[in-house]
Design a protein with these regions (language model features):
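Outer-membrane beta-barrel biogenesis signature
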Residues: 19-37, 45
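Gram-negative bacterial Sec-dependent N-terminal signal peptides
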Residues: 1-20
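Internal, conserved structured core segments that host functional sites
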Residues: 135-162
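Post-signal peptide N-terminal segment of secreted/secretory-pathway proteins
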Residues: 73-77, 81, 85-87, 93
Length: 317
Protein backbone atom coordinates (compact mmCIF):
# COMPACT_ATOMS: atom_id res chain seq x y z
CA UNK A 1 0.00 0.00 0.00
CA UNK A 2 2.84 2.38 0.88
CA UNK A 3 4.56 1.71 -2.45
CA UNK A 4 1.31 2.44 -4.27
CA UNK A 5 0.88 5.76 -2.46
CA UNK A 6 4.46 6.71 -3.21
CA UNK A 7 3.96 5.90 -6.88
CA UNK A 8 0.85 8.06 -7.00
CA UNK A 9 2.45 11.12 -5.44
CA UNK A 10 5.64 10.83 -7.48
CA UNK A 11 3.74 10.74 -10.77
CA UNK A 12 1.40 13.61 -9.88
CA UNK A 13 3.51 16.41 -11.39
CA UNK A 14 4.03 14.40 -14.58
CA UNK A 15 0.30 13.91 -14.96
CA UNK A 16 -0.33 17.60 -14.35
CA UNK A 17 2.17 18.64 -16.99
CA UNK A 18 0.96 16.15 -19.62
CA UNK A 19 -0.74 18.98 -21.45
CA UNK A 20 2.65 20.48 -22.27
CA UNK A 21 4.48 19.85 -25.51
CA UNK A 22 7.21 17.25 -25.37
CA UNK A 23 10.71 18.68 -24.87
CA UNK A 24 14.00 16.96 -25.56
CA UNK A 25 15.90 16.34 -22.34
CA UNK A 26 19.37 17.85 -22.39
CA UNK A 27 21.89 17.92 -19.57
CA UNK A 28 23.27 21.43 -20.07
CA UNK A 29 24.64 23.97 -17.59
CA UNK A 30 21.59 26.18 -18.11
CA UNK A 31 19.38 23.51 -16.54
CA UNK A 32 21.05 23.25 -13.11
CA UNK A 33 21.15 25.26 -9.90
CA UNK A 34 22.66 24.42 -6.52
CA UNK A 35 22.73 26.03 -3.12
CA UNK A 36 24.53 25.62 0.18
CA UNK A 37 23.78 27.24 3.52
CA UNK A 38 24.61 27.23 7.22
CA UNK A 39 22.16 27.65 10.05
CA UNK A 40 20.59 26.33 13.23
CA UNK A 41 18.06 23.67 14.22
CA UNK A 42 15.76 24.00 17.24
CA UNK A 43 12.75 22.01 18.36
CA UNK A 44 11.24 19.34 20.55
CA UNK A 45 10.50 15.66 20.09
CA UNK A 46 8.13 13.67 22.29
CA UNK A 47 7.55 10.03 23.15
CA UNK A 48 4.46 8.83 24.96
CA UNK A 49 3.25 5.63 26.64
CA UNK A 50 -0.42 4.61 26.85
CA UNK A 51 -2.14 1.82 28.79
CA UNK A 52 -4.75 -0.01 26.73
CA UNK A 53 -6.08 -1.78 29.83
CA UNK A 54 -6.93 1.63 31.32
CA UNK A 55 -8.82 2.96 28.33
CA UNK A 56 -5.70 4.05 26.47
CA UNK A 57 -4.86 6.84 28.91
CA UNK A 58 -1.40 8.41 28.83
CA UNK A 59 0.84 7.19 31.65
CA UNK A 60 4.24 8.52 30.56
CA UNK A 61 5.76 11.24 28.38
CA UNK A 62 9.36 12.18 27.63
CA UNK A 63 10.08 15.60 26.12
CA UNK A 64 13.45 16.02 24.40
CA UNK A 65 14.25 19.67 23.68
CA UNK A 66 17.12 21.09 21.63
CA UNK A 67 18.11 24.63 20.61
CA UNK A 68 20.43 26.18 18.04
CA UNK A 69 22.22 23.06 16.84
CA UNK A 70 24.55 24.06 13.99
CA UNK A 71 23.65 22.53 10.62
CA UNK A 72 24.83 22.58 7.03
CA UNK A 73 22.22 22.34 4.29
CA UNK A 74 22.45 21.82 0.55
CA UNK A 75 20.31 21.24 -2.53
CA UNK A 76 20.61 20.67 -6.26
CA UNK A 77 17.84 21.06 -8.84
CA UNK A 78 17.71 20.14 -12.52
CA UNK A 79 15.11 21.54 -14.92
CA UNK A 80 14.49 18.58 -17.20
CA UNK A 81 12.16 20.69 -19.34
CA UNK A 82 10.13 23.89 -18.83
CA UNK A 83 7.36 21.96 -17.03
CA UNK A 84 9.38 19.43 -14.99
CA UNK A 85 12.18 19.73 -12.42
CA UNK A 86 13.80 17.14 -10.18
CA UNK A 87 15.75 17.88 -7.04
CA UNK A 88 17.65 16.51 -4.07
CA UNK A 89 18.22 18.26 -0.76
CA UNK A 90 19.41 17.52 2.73
CA UNK A 91 20.91 18.79 5.93
CA UNK A 92 22.92 17.44 8.85
CA UNK A 93 24.08 18.69 12.21
CA UNK A 94 27.75 19.64 12.40
CA UNK A 95 28.19 18.17 15.87
CA UNK A 96 26.37 17.35 19.08
CA UNK A 97 24.43 20.02 20.92
CA UNK A 98 23.29 20.37 24.52
CA UNK A 99 19.59 20.05 25.22
CA UNK A 100 17.18 19.09 27.96
CA UNK A 101 14.89 16.16 28.74
CA UNK A 102 11.96 15.85 31.14
CA UNK A 103 10.36 12.46 31.91
CA UNK A 104 6.95 12.43 33.61
CA UNK A 105 4.64 9.57 34.66
CA UNK A 106 0.97 9.57 35.66
CA UNK A 107 0.62 6.28 37.53
CA UNK A 108 -2.41 7.07 39.74
CA UNK A 109 -5.48 6.13 37.70
CA UNK A 110 -7.75 7.81 40.26
CA UNK A 111 -6.01 11.14 39.63
CA UNK A 112 -4.84 10.94 36.00
CA UNK A 113 -4.22 14.67 35.60
CA UNK A 114 -1.47 14.84 38.24
CA UNK A 115 2.00 13.43 37.64
CA UNK A 116 3.35 11.02 40.21
CA UNK A 117 6.96 10.68 39.02
CA UNK A 118 9.30 13.09 37.30
CA UNK A 119 12.95 13.17 36.35
CA UNK A 120 14.84 16.08 34.80
CA UNK A 121 18.03 15.74 32.80
CA UNK A 122 19.69 19.07 31.92
CA UNK A 123 22.79 17.14 30.80
CA UNK A 124 21.15 15.96 27.58
CA UNK A 125 22.80 15.86 24.16
CA UNK A 126 21.36 15.94 20.69
CA UNK A 127 23.96 13.52 19.30
CA UNK A 128 23.00 14.08 15.68
CA UNK A 129 20.11 14.91 13.37
CA UNK A 130 19.87 14.74 9.60
CA UNK A 131 17.45 14.67 6.68
CA UNK A 132 17.36 13.96 2.96
CA UNK A 133 14.66 14.84 0.42
CA UNK A 134 14.14 13.65 -3.17
CA UNK A 135 11.46 15.47 -5.13
CA UNK A 136 9.90 16.26 -8.49
CA UNK A 137 8.05 19.44 -9.43
CA UNK A 138 5.46 20.09 -12.12
CA UNK A 139 5.29 23.78 -13.05
CA UNK A 140 1.84 25.21 -13.68
CA UNK A 141 3.35 28.67 -14.24
CA UNK A 142 6.96 29.14 -15.29
CA UNK A 143 7.93 32.67 -16.27
CA UNK A 144 11.23 34.55 -15.85
CA UNK A 145 9.95 36.48 -12.81
CA UNK A 146 7.58 33.99 -11.21
CA UNK A 147 6.95 30.25 -10.87
CA UNK A 148 4.18 28.18 -9.34
CA UNK A 149 4.10 24.41 -9.23
CA UNK A 150 2.97 21.22 -7.56
CA UNK A 151 5.56 18.91 -6.05
CA UNK A 152 5.86 15.40 -4.68
CA UNK A 153 8.71 13.57 -3.06
CA UNK A 154 10.15 11.28 -0.43
CA UNK A 155 11.83 12.44 2.76
CA UNK A 156 13.58 10.82 5.73
CA UNK A 157 14.82 12.40 8.94
CA UNK A 158 16.63 11.05 12.01
CA UNK A 159 17.31 12.26 15.56
CA UNK A 160 19.49 10.79 18.32
CA UNK A 161 19.68 11.84 21.99
CA UNK A 162 21.42 10.80 25.20
CA UNK A 163 20.35 11.96 28.69
CA UNK A 164 22.84 11.75 31.58
CA UNK A 165 22.66 12.41 35.29
CA UNK A 166 19.80 14.58 36.51
CA UNK A 167 17.39 14.64 39.44
CA UNK A 168 14.13 12.88 40.26
CA UNK A 169 10.96 13.10 42.32
CA UNK A 170 9.21 9.73 42.61
CA UNK A 171 6.15 8.49 44.48
CA UNK A 172 6.52 5.42 46.68
CA UNK A 173 3.73 2.88 47.09
CA UNK A 174 2.77 4.50 50.39
CA UNK A 175 3.37 8.15 49.55
CA UNK A 176 3.17 10.89 46.93
CA UNK A 177 6.29 12.58 45.52
CA UNK A 178 8.15 11.49 48.64
CA UNK A 179 11.26 9.95 47.06
CA UNK A 180 13.63 12.76 46.02
CA UNK A 181 17.17 12.35 44.80
CA UNK A 182 19.63 12.63 41.94
CA UNK A 183 21.49 10.41 39.51
CA UNK A 184 25.30 10.33 39.35
CA UNK A 185 26.66 13.11 37.15
CA UNK A 186 27.67 11.90 33.72
CA UNK A 187 25.97 8.52 34.08
CA UNK A 188 23.83 7.55 31.09
CA UNK A 189 20.15 7.45 31.98
CA UNK A 190 18.26 7.14 28.68
CA UNK A 191 19.20 7.01 25.00
CA UNK A 192 16.59 7.80 22.39
CA UNK A 193 16.38 7.70 18.58
CA UNK A 194 13.60 8.71 16.20
CA UNK A 195 13.23 8.11 12.48
CA UNK A 196 10.58 9.46 10.10
CA UNK A 197 9.90 8.18 6.57
CA UNK A 198 7.35 9.92 4.38
CA UNK A 199 6.15 10.39 0.83
CA UNK A 200 4.67 13.87 0.53
CA UNK A 201 2.93 16.32 -1.77
CA UNK A 202 3.26 20.07 -1.83
CA UNK A 203 2.99 23.47 -3.46
CA UNK A 204 5.96 25.70 -4.28
CA UNK A 205 6.42 29.09 -5.88
CA UNK A 206 8.63 32.15 -6.18
CA UNK A 207 8.37 35.77 -7.30
CA UNK A 208 11.21 38.05 -8.43
CA UNK A 209 11.24 41.84 -8.54
CA UNK A 210 14.42 43.28 -10.03
CA UNK A 211 17.20 41.69 -7.94
CA UNK A 212 14.98 40.59 -5.04
CA UNK A 213 13.26 37.20 -4.88
CA UNK A 214 10.79 35.65 -2.45
CA UNK A 215 9.97 31.92 -2.34
CA UNK A 216 7.45 29.81 -0.41
CA UNK A 217 7.03 26.02 -0.17
CA UNK A 218 4.31 24.05 1.62
CA UNK A 219 4.55 20.27 2.10
CA UNK A 220 2.04 17.78 3.49
CA UNK A 221 1.99 14.05 4.16
CA UNK A 222 -0.65 11.80 5.66
CA UNK A 223 1.53 8.71 5.25
CA UNK A 224 4.35 9.25 7.74
CA UNK A 225 5.90 6.10 9.17
CA UNK A 226 7.69 6.86 12.43
CA UNK A 227 9.81 4.56 14.56
CA UNK A 228 11.82 5.02 17.73
CA UNK A 229 14.20 3.20 20.06
CA UNK A 230 14.37 4.00 23.78
CA UNK A 231 17.21 2.55 25.88
CA UNK A 232 16.89 2.74 29.68
CA UNK A 233 20.41 2.23 31.06
CA UNK A 234 19.56 1.90 34.77
CA UNK A 235 21.24 -1.41 35.81
CA UNK A 236 18.21 -2.28 37.92
CA UNK A 237 15.79 -1.65 35.05
CA UNK A 238 17.74 -2.25 31.83
CA UNK A 239 14.93 -2.12 29.24
CA UNK A 240 14.73 -1.44 25.50
CA UNK A 241 11.50 -0.01 24.08
CA UNK A 242 10.79 0.05 20.33
CA UNK A 243 7.72 1.67 18.76
CA UNK A 244 6.22 2.11 15.30
CA UNK A 245 3.49 4.51 14.24
CA UNK A 246 1.92 4.64 10.78
CA UNK A 247 -0.02 7.22 8.77
CA UNK A 248 0.85 10.27 10.85
CA UNK A 249 0.37 13.78 9.50
CA UNK A 250 3.28 16.00 8.51
CA UNK A 251 3.21 19.73 7.77
CA UNK A 252 6.03 21.97 6.58
CA UNK A 253 6.21 25.63 5.59
CA UNK A 254 9.38 27.21 4.21
CA UNK A 255 9.91 30.88 3.35
CA UNK A 256 13.06 32.35 1.82
CA UNK A 257 14.12 35.81 0.69
CA UNK A 258 17.14 36.52 -1.45
CA UNK A 259 19.10 39.09 -3.41
CA UNK A 260 20.96 38.50 -6.69
CA UNK A 261 24.49 39.82 -6.30
CA UNK A 262 25.23 38.71 -9.88
CA UNK A 263 22.89 37.44 -12.63
CA UNK A 264 23.66 33.87 -11.53
CA UNK A 265 24.37 34.13 -7.79
CA UNK A 266 21.86 34.83 -5.04
CA UNK A 267 22.41 35.23 -1.31
CA UNK A 268 19.40 34.34 0.81
CA UNK A 269 17.96 33.67 4.25
CA UNK A 270 15.39 30.96 4.90
CA UNK A 271 13.13 29.75 7.69
CA UNK A 272 11.45 26.32 7.73
CA UNK A 273 8.87 25.02 10.22
CA UNK A 274 8.17 21.27 10.35
CA UNK A 275 5.78 19.20 12.41
CA UNK A 276 4.82 15.52 12.69
CA UNK A 277 1.66 15.27 14.78
CA UNK A 278 1.16 12.71 17.53
CA UNK A 279 -0.58 9.42 16.85
CA UNK A 280 -0.78 6.11 18.69
CA UNK A 281 1.17 3.11 17.49
CA UNK A 282 2.45 -0.26 18.65
CA UNK A 283 5.34 -0.81 21.02
CA UNK A 284 7.47 -3.69 22.25
CA UNK A 285 9.87 -3.95 25.15
CA UNK A 286 12.73 -6.23 26.08
CA UNK A 287 13.89 -6.56 29.68
CA UNK A 288 17.63 -7.28 29.64
CA UNK A 289 17.68 -8.24 33.32
CA UNK A 290 15.31 -11.20 33.15
CA UNK A 291 15.29 -11.77 29.35
CA UNK A 292 11.55 -11.22 28.95
CA UNK A 293 9.62 -9.27 26.33
CA UNK A 294 6.18 -7.74 25.90
CA UNK A 295 4.10 -6.15 23.14
CA UNK A 296 1.37 -3.52 23.34
CA UNK A 297 -0.96 -2.37 20.59
CA UNK A 298 -1.60 1.38 20.57
CA UNK A 299 0.79 1.70 23.49
CA UNK A 300 3.06 4.41 22.11
CA UNK A 301 2.98 7.90 20.64
CA UNK A 302 5.62 9.77 18.63
CA UNK A 303 5.70 13.50 17.84
CA UNK A 304 8.24 16.00 16.53
CA UNK A 305 8.38 19.67 15.63
CA UNK A 306 11.33 21.84 14.73
CA UNK A 307 12.38 25.14 13.19
CA UNK A 308 15.37 25.66 10.89
CA UNK A 309 16.95 28.99 10.02
CA UNK A 310 19.72 29.26 7.42
CA UNK A 311 21.65 31.76 5.34
CA UNK A 312 23.36 30.73 2.15
CA UNK A 313 24.27 31.08 -1.50
CA UNK A 314 22.41 29.78 -4.55
CA UNK A 315 24.12 29.58 -7.94
CA UNK A 316 22.56 28.89 -11.34
CA UNK A 317 24.91 27.31 -13.86
Amino acid sequence: MRAKLLGIVLTTPIAISSFASTETLSFTPDNINADISLGTLSGKTKERVYLAEEGGRKVSQLDWKFNNAAIIKGAINWDLMPQISIGAAGWTTLGSRGGNMVDQDWMDSSNPGTWTDESRHPDTQLNYANEFDLNIKGWLLNEPNYRLGLMAGYQESRYSFTARGGSYIYSSEEGFRDDIGSFPNGERAIGYKQRFKMPYIGLTGSYRYEDFELGVTFKYSGWVEASDNDEHYDPGKRITYRSKVKDQNYYSVSVNAGYYVTPNAKVYVEGTWNRVTNKKGNTSLYDHNDNTSDYSKNGAGIENYNFITTAGLKYTF
